[in-house]
């Protein structure tokens, strides 16, 4: 009789323990499966997220084989408005230039420049001080391509033509002799200098242009003197190269 009672009791205890442990085992199985799938997902995510960087060189297509180019810059010019004036004048304006390249090294260049500013004046009874003066240049000549690579270049040029000097526009109707100015006139002009270019792309260039400017003005009063002046000019701007037409 004791055997029959103990057996059902032991069986009942074993069954109860099994029922209690079953959820724990199931939870551990799910946790292990979730952890395994998480590792796989993270690995896949890291694999697909890795990209390749492509380096683009904006100067890769820079070639010195274009037939035409044009440039425009803000310009500065120092000059003297009269043959005996002690003070010079600093003028500002625009510098427009264009080139037609004949060979790899040689081309023809033209320029049009306008400068405007005020100038010192000789003592006068009309209290004229700091009148406006202007110069308009036009010229053409050869240019030569010097050292160059994809980053930049040096170009030399020598252009000759004329200048229209307007010196009497702000004298209140008085003659130029009152302030020792030149008369309004057309005169010979020469521009000798060059360009310093910094390429920014196949088409666009940052350009600095220093020049020596020669002028030959005269006066029609007094001794009718003619003055040969050499002054400094500088412009800073941009150049555009038309690359479809090759040399």
PLM feature segments, named:
Residues 1-7:
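N-terminal secretory signal peptides that target proteins for export/translocation
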Residues 21-27:
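Sec/Tat signal peptide C-region and signal peptidase I cleavage site
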Residues 57-58, 80-84, 121-131, 174-182, ...:
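Extracellular loop and loop/strand-boundary signature of outer-membrane beta-barrel proteins
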Residues 97-177, 187-189, 193, 200, ...:
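Gram-negative (and chloroplast) outer-membrane scaffold detector with strong preference
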Residues 230-247:
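Outer-membrane beta-barrel "beta-signal"
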């Amino acid at each position: 009789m004791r055997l029959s009672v103990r057996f059902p009791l032991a069986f009942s205890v074993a069954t109860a323990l099994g029922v209690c442990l079953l959820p724990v085992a199931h939870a551990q199985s799910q946790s292990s499966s979730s952890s395994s799938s998480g590792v796989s997902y993270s690995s896949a995510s890291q694999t697909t997220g890795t990209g390749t960087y492509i380096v683009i060189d904006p100067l890769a297509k820079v070639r010195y084989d274009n037939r035409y180019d044009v440039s425009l810059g803000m310009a500065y010019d120092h000059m003297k408005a009269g043959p005996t004036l002690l003070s010079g004048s600093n003028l500002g304006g625009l510098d427009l230039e264009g080139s037609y390249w004949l060979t790899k090294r040689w081309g023809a260049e033209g320029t049009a420049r306008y400068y405007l500013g005020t100038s010192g004046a000789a003592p006068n009874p009309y209290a004229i001080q700091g009148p406006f003066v202007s110069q308009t240049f036009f010229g053409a000549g050869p240019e030569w391509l010097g050292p160059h690579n994809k980053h930049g270049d040096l170009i030399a040029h020598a252009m000759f033509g004329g200048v229209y000097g307007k010196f009497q526009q702000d004298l209140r109707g008085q003659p130029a002799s009152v302030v020792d100015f030149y008369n309004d006139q057309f005169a010979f002009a020469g521009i000798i200098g060059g360009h310093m270019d910094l390429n920014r792309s196949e088409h666009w260039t940052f350009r600095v242009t220093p020049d020596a400017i020669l002028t030959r003005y005269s006066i029609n009063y007094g001794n009718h003197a003619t003055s040969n002046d050499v002054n400094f000019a500088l412009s800073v701007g941009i150049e555009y190269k038309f690359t479809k037409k090759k040399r």
